[in-house]
Curated annotation (Swiss-Prot):
Enzyme Commission number: 2.1.1.77
Catalytic activity reported: [protein]-L-isoaspartate + S-adenosyl-L-methionine = [protein]-L-isoaspartate alpha-methyl ester + S-adenosyl-L-homocysteine
Cell compartments where the protein resides: Cytoplasm
Keyword GTP-binding: no
Gene Ontology cellular component list: cytoplasm
CDD domains: AdoMet_MTases
Name the UniProt record assigns to this protein: Protein-L-isoaspartate O-methyltransferase
Pfam families: PCMT
Classification via InterPro entries: PCMT, SAM-dependent_MTases_sf
Top-tier EC class: transferase
Catalytic residue list: S56
Function: Catalyzes the methyl esterification of L-isoaspartyl residues in peptides and proteins that result from spontaneous decomposition of normal L-aspartyl and L-asparaginyl residues. It plays a role in the repair and/or degradation of damaged proteins.
Family: Belongs to the methyltransferase superfamily. L-isoaspartyl/D-aspartyl protein methyltransferase family.
Amino acid sequence: MGDWGRADYLSRHGIKDARVLEAIARLNRADFVPEDLREEASADSPLPIGHGQTISQPYVVALMTEALQLQGDERVLEIGTGSGYQTALLSLLCREVYSVEIVPELAQSAREVLGRQGFENVSFREGDGSLGWPDQAPFDAILAAAAPPDVPLQLLSQLKPGGRMIIPVGPRGGTQQLLRIQRALRPGEVPQVESLLSVRFVPMTGQPLSQG
């Protein structure tokens, strides 16, 4: 059973992309949370999924997905598979999803959940999301569900010219900014950066990010 009520709620709270709302309506968030939290899955709030990680607030998931402006033929890199809920949503909205998760237990769990539900256009990789997935780059879009302290140039370099990245950036444990970054069309031009929302995401772990 999907979340038709959630899609209606999100529509009334500012999410306008009909494709995003339809995809959310097709998914049941309770399928992606620990069994003892399934009764809480209907709430518009983040929930713990173990190993210090969370499944994000549904409104934030929808906002991030809408900001990618997916049309259906994109190749998308996801940093932080987590529960697999965001992965499933992206899978319904683009051609291919490449998802990286650093926590082995979460990577395995998400792979199993999405496999049971028949998602076939998702490739998984266990490892350091701060490095992206260089051998599959470039991507039309990148979505990160963990926050580095600064904009990671390693990930930005894996976008196609004109590609979009949605990423929370800011201090560990503090308020971060959810950014929409569009890579310039021509070498030497400055990317376009827009702040969408103040958020608090788990930190992006892994090796230090290269800034040049």
